Design a protein with these regions (language model features):
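ATP/Mg2+-dependent ligation/transfer catalytic cores
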Residues: 1-208, 226-240, 251, 387-388, ...
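Membrane-targeting and insertion segments and their boundary/processing signals
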Residues: 13, 162, 166, 212, ...
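Active-site capping/gating regions of soluble enzymes
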Residues: 17, 25-32, 37-47, 51-119, ...
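Histidine-centered divalent-metal-coordination microenvironment in nucleic-acid enzymes
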Residues: 112, 151-165, 207-222, 256-278
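Generic beta-structure capping elements
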Residues: 224, 275, 344, 486-488
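Short, local alpha-helical segments
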Residues: 224, 370-376, 419-428
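Eukaryote-specific, cytoplasm-facing alpha-helical/coiled-coil scaffolding segments in long proteins
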Residues: 323-325, 414-422, 466-475
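Intrinsically disordered, low-complexity charged/polar segments
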Residues: 407-437
């Protein structure tokens, strides 16, 4: 059970219970006790952004009605693959998601919602329910739980005042005054935590440059591992908060995968771990486990088509080029940032680091094996987070079912920087990621049956994603725009506020 001690979420503190135990009566009590008159239903549309439906609480009966029944919405305006002739959907609030809107002048309670069809059944093709189905299939087929967390990268843009300039492309973990937006990031982190986000840390990132009188500073907020459905909710809310606070303070914010040539693009790396009975299955005897290697094998197999969920506009493929802090080839390795799937440091040495650093300590007994994850490095924030998490969950389940999974993992493992000249022969043997949305759609077409297995992704949704990717007509676009600064700027402007 999640701890309620020192929670940043106002409802957890007031109700003295974890969010996953909230009931309708709890929500009503908090609203009445705090004199709240406004309620927002929020839900991610097909573009992955949060949509909002506002309510004013007329009386207690009306509050009970909307909490119990939800409300109608036009599904064809939210999802491109829903026909206008039969588009009515229900949105029904999830009480565990409750948080106070940090931007509303009038006290407003927000609730994330699930979609239901006319028959009162979950909408099969909604991204949120697709992720739910993926997690349920994973649990049913493996007896384990799929958990995840994201590293959310973004650029903050403001006028360049010329004071304490940071070194170009050397902004990683920089401090003030060379990093200009630490306070903005801290305020974002607080609001995200108050909305239920479980944050690991935040810091400035590599990207830091000036252009045309503007300062571009890259930042990252990283979360803690949790059930994948919660992880997707947290990332979706986080993007909404970062954008809103930026707008409030007069700062421009972009999650775009690439905003100029030669500078670090922004990714959305996803860390994963597999749990059973509350125990992390990614390590065994201090080394990466067979379970982890099999899950990685699934990602190696499905890597080309995972881009269909994780890299959803043409600028995504301007980021996936060599020497730009982004992967290009299908491989994995330990502590290796040139690979697609990285196994980061996981505190596997069993050394009491705290005692060594602090001689006055008697020793700690923290179970560090719970911390090990594996990281998929190709996605970016153009992704619909729910579909991306669902795709990764499917890939890990698929890997666990492969008879030759361990062999696949062995064949795709590398322990060198694959982009160095001396490793050119090795690089030539590795499969490459798609170079366009068009190519990504082709990869999805070839591998779609894996995603449709167990009814996780609906055929209509796969068709819709492929059509959306093909519509960009970007088969040769990467080669074209890299030769033209004007074409590059036009493309970046088009997708500047993606995701």
């Amino acid at each position: 059970m999640a701890s309620t001690s020192y929670s940043a979420n106002a409802l957890v503190t007031a109700l003295k219970k974890p969010r996953d135990k909230f009931t309708k009566e709890d929500i009503k009590k908090y609203i009445f006790d705090n004199g709240i008159r406004h309620l927002n239903f929020m839900y991610a549309g097909g573009d992955g952004r949060l949509k909002t439906l506002n309510f004013v609480i007329n009386d207690a009966d009306y509050l009970d009605e909307i909490l119990s029944c939800g409300e109608r919405v036009d599904g064809s305006s939210l999802f491109s693959y829903i026909e206008a002739s039969s588009s009515d959907l229900y949105v029904v609030p999830k009480f565990s998601s409750a948080f106070m809107d940090p931007f509303a002048e009038l006290p407003t309670l927000c609730l994330l919602c699930s979609f239901f069809n006319k028959d009162g059944q979950p909408l099969e093709s909604s991204p949120e329910y697709t992720l739910h189905k993926a997690c349920e299939a994973f649990k049913k087929e493996t007896g384990m739980e799929f958990q995840a967390m994201g590293e959310l990268e973004y650029y903050v843009i403001a006028d360049d005042m010329g004071e304490f300039p940071a070194v170009d492309q050397r902004g990683y973990h920089e401090s003030a005054p060379f990093a200009k937006f630490n306070e903005f990031r801290q305020q974002c982190m607080l609001y995200i935590a108050q909305a239920g986000g479980q944050i690991k840390y935040g810091h400035s990132e590599v990207g830091n440059f000036t252009q045309d009188g503007k300062l571009y500073e890259q930042n990252e907020i990283e979360f803690l591992p949790c059930p994948a459905e919660d992880a997707a909710n947290q990332l979706t809310i986080a993007k909404w908060i970062i954008r809103n606070l930026g707008a409030q303070l007069g700062l421009d914010v972009t999650f775009a995968p690439k905003i100029t040539v030669g500078k670090a693009g922004s990714g959305l790396h996803i860390h994963m771990r597999i749990m059973k009975d509350g125990n992390n299955q990614m390590l065994k005897n201090g080394v990466i486990s067979e379970t982890a290697r099999r899950a990685i094998a699934g990602m190696m197999k499905l890597a080309p088509s995972i881009t269909a969920f994780g890299n959803q506009n043409p600028t995504s493929y301007l980021r996936l080029v060599p020497h730009q802090e982004a992967p290009t080839n299908v491989c994995w390795g330990d502590r290796n940032r040139s690979v697609l799937v990285r196994v980061p440091l996981g505190w596997a040495s069993k050394t009491d680091l705290c005692k060594i650093a602090n001689p006055n300590e008697k020793g700690t007994s923290y179970d560090t094996h719970q911390k090990q994850t594996v990281e998929m490095r190709s996605p970016d924030a153009s992704a619909n987070v729910y579909l991306l998490m669902a795709g990764l969950c499917v890939a890990c389940r698929y890997g666990l079912s492969l008879k030759d999974g361990l062999k696949v993992a062995e064949q795709t493992y590398v322990n060198v920087n694959i982009h160095k000249k001396e490793n050119a022969k090795l690089l030539s043997k590795l499969d490459t990621l798609p170079d366009s949305c068009w190519a990504s759609a082709d990869c999805l077409a070839k591998q779609r049956k894996v995603y449709e297995e167990f009814g996780v992704f609906s055929p209509a949704m796969i068709d819709g994603i492929m059509a959306q990717l093909k519509a960009f007509k970007d088969k040769t676009l990467r080669a074209q725009v890299t030769k033209s600064k004007t074409a590059m700027q036009k493309l970046v402007k088009t997708y500047f506020y993606c995701g």
